């Protein structure tokens, strides 16, 4: 029986477009000069309050690194946590554009108490109660981590990528990894392979080998669970297009905003912790001091939830 997964449906749609001489939105490329001024709004704000202020179909990508029910949070029990998560998941689905995606970071509570909330709980809920598609489960594999004596030392974290519809945006070319020269030369001689695809590089797969930030990392701004910019960059480049809006309502360290500025996207970043504003400003300083931003790229920083609309005015549906 033929595999009728949404992945194959997407390939068939892409091939049909190419035969007719058309291009899918994920094949378009915009230079920095075409993006114009991007806008970046931030505030200290609860996730549900943030989402309530946003219109339907208004953002392209949501980066989501939620707190988990691991005895460190203020939920009374597992059902309280899941009930809370269901509310922001439903709102996230509402605000995503038809081509949009949400990338949810999380871990598995291997030896936690029965019923502890983790990414499995969220995936299970989404598969049973949402129309969104589980496009990929990404394994972030890192070499550095805690040692262990009673179990195999953990060296990975999961990222669940859900797409709102089968029309989701995905720009593989933006995140391809180059082949080494020896492999590239061998592949170019293989008549079964497309030379253009070989030239572009390999699909990075859903296993991403990237180090976590250590205590001495220059990226660190003080947040205890800060994610490396490289991980966020790959998500932003692959799942959003230049000029679109990236939302992060558990923004923590503020790294999503920094990456959005670098990549020519608009952003809305909020967090319930008052210290978030301090982290956000550190990210901006890091960006400017280290020359990570294209000098030709223009961006504006706006504080306050009342200004969310400023980051949405460019629109988000790739066409």
Swiss-Prot record:
Intrachain disulfide bonds: none
Any one GO molecular-function label of the UniProt entry? N-methyltransferase activity
Query: Which EC main class describes this enzyme?
Result: transferase
Any idea of its EC number? Answer: 2.1.1.72
Describe the pH profile of activity.
Optimum pH is 7.5.
Instruction: List compositional bias (Basic residues) regions by residue number.
Output: 1-10
Note the superkingdom of the native organism: Bacteria
The chemistry this enzyme catalyses reads:
a 2'-deoxyadenosine in DNA + S-adenosyl-L-methionine = an N(6)-methyl-2'-deoxyadenosine in DNA + S-adenosyl-L-homocysteine + H(+)
Annotated region (Disordered) at 1-32
Q: Name one GO biological process term.
A: DNA restriction-modification system
What keywords sit in the KW lines?
DNA-binding, Methyltransferase, Restriction system, S-adenosyl-L-methionine, Transferase
Q: How is its activity regulated?
A: Strongly inhibited by N-ethylmaleimide, inactivated by MgCl(2) or MgSO(4).
The record ties this protein, via InterPro entries, to: DNA_methylase_N4/N6, DNA_methylase_N6_adenine_CS, N4/N6-MTase_EcoPI_Mod-like, SAM-dependent_MTases_sf
Pfam families recorded: N6_N4_Mtase
Explain how this protein's activity depends on temperature. Answer: Optimum temperature is 37 degrees Celsius. It has about 60% activity at 30 degrees Celsius, the optimal growth temperature for this bacteria.
Similarity comment text for this entry? Belongs to the N(4)/N(6)-methyltransferase family.
Name assigned to this protein: Type II methyltransferase M.RsrI
Task: Give the source species.
Answer: Cereibacter sphaeroides
Q: Gene encoding this chain?
A: rsrIM
């Amino acid at each position: 029986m033929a595999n009728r997964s949404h992945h194959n449906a997407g390939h068939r749609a892409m091939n049909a477009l190419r035969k007719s001489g058309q291009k899918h939105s994920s094949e378009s490329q915009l230079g920095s000069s075409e993006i114009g001024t991007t806008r970046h709004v931030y505030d200290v704000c609860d996730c549900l309050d943030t989402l309530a202020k946003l219109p339907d179909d208004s953002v392209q990508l949501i980066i989501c690194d939620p707190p988990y029910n691991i005895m460190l949070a203020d939920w009374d029990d597992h059902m309280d946590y899941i009930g809370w998560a269901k509310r922001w998941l439903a709102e996230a689905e509402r605000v995503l554009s038809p081509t949009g995606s949400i990338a949810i970071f999380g871990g598995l509570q291997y030896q936690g108490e029965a019923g502890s909330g983790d990414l499995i709980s969220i995936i299970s809920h989404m598969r049973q109660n949402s129309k969104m598609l589980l496009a990929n489960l990404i394994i972030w594999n890192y070499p550095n981590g805690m040692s262990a004596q009673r179990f195999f030392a953990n060296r990975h974290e999961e990222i669940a990528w859900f797409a709102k519809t089968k029309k989701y945006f995905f720009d593989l070319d933006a995140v391809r990894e180059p082949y080494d020269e020896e492999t590239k030369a061998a592949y170019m001689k293989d008549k079964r392979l497309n030379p253009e695809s070989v030239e572009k590089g390999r699909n990075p797969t859903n296993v991403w080998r990237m180090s976590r930030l250590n205590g001495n990392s220059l990226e660190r701004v003080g947040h205890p669970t800060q994610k490396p910019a490289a991980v966020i960059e790959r998500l932003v480049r692959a799942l959003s297009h230049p000029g679109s809006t990236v939302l992060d309502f558990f923004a923590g360290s503020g790294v999503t905003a920094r990456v959005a500025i670098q990549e020519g996207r608009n952003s809305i970043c909020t967090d319930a912790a008052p210290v978030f504003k301090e982290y956000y400003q550190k990210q901006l300083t890091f960006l400017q001091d280290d020359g990570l931003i294209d000098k030709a790229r223009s961006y504006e920083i706006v504080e306050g939830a009342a200004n969310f609309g400023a980051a949405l005015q460019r629109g988000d549906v790739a066409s």
